[in-house]
């Protein structure tokens, strides 16, 4: 299993930090009006409708269209990262500014915040997953890839270094 050390200086934000607020975290949760737990495989960042959404990593656009599973207008960027294939996913966009096959650099404009798909208001749903052919995708907490945001709830967050495990 590889352990990656990410320095705070390497973080980028898909939405400017002074604009976005994390409203839902990675992990198990109970949705309003429901009784069963569901896994939330990303983070939700509330932001004004139309705010720019930017890539956090360089890579190739492998999906830029409407997602039929609830993500609305969505962009996937596939990158090589620490010997793994990593996908960063940006969902519920109001507009997509890239096309499938394009190569993007970190901080490239991908689209704008929206409320498309299964959404309760303008926000960005941001996911990270490791592609594992024949084994299924492995979702990772995307907070290790972004700079700090304001939060609805105080949770521990490491400012100077973050460790994540990628692999089995």
Predicted regions and their residues:
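Generic beta-structure capping elements
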Residues: 25-27, 80, 93, 145
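Short acidic/polar mixed-charge low-complexity motifs
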Residues: 51, 84-86, 134-138
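Positively charged n-region of N-terminal signal peptides that target proteins for export
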Residues: 1-3
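Surface-exposed, glycine-biased beta-strand/turn segments
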Residues: 6-73, 106, 115, 119, ...
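Zn2+-dependent peptidoglycan hydrolase active-site motif and core
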Residues: 38-40, 55-97, 122-130
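Short peripheral tails and domain-boundary helices/loops at the edges of structured domains
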Residues: 129-155
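Short glycine/proline-centered loop/turn elements that form peptide/ligand docking sites
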Residues: 97-98, 109, 115-122
């Amino acid at each position: 299993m590889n352990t990656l050390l990410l320095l705070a200086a390497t973080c980028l934000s898909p939405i400017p930090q002074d604009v976005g607020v994390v409203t839902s975290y990675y992990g198990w949760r109970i949705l309003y009006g429901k009784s069963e737990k569901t896994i939330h495989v990303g983070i939700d960042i509330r932001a004004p409708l139309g705010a720019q959404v930017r890539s956090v990593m360089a890579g190739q656009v492998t999906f830029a269209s409407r997602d039929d599973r609830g993500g609305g207008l969505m962009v996937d960027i596939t990158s090589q990262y620490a010997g793994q294939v990593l996908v960063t996913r940006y969902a519920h966009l109001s507009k997509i500014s890239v096309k499938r096959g394009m190569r993007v650099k970190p901080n490239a404009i991908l689209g704008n915040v929206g409320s498309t798909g299964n959404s309760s208001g303008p926000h960005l749903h941001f996911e990270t997953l490791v592609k594992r052919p024949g084994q299924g995708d492995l979702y990772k907490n995307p907070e290790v890839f972004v700079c700090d945001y304001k939060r609805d709830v105080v949770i521990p967050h490491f400012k100077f270094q973050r460790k994540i495990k990628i692999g089995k």
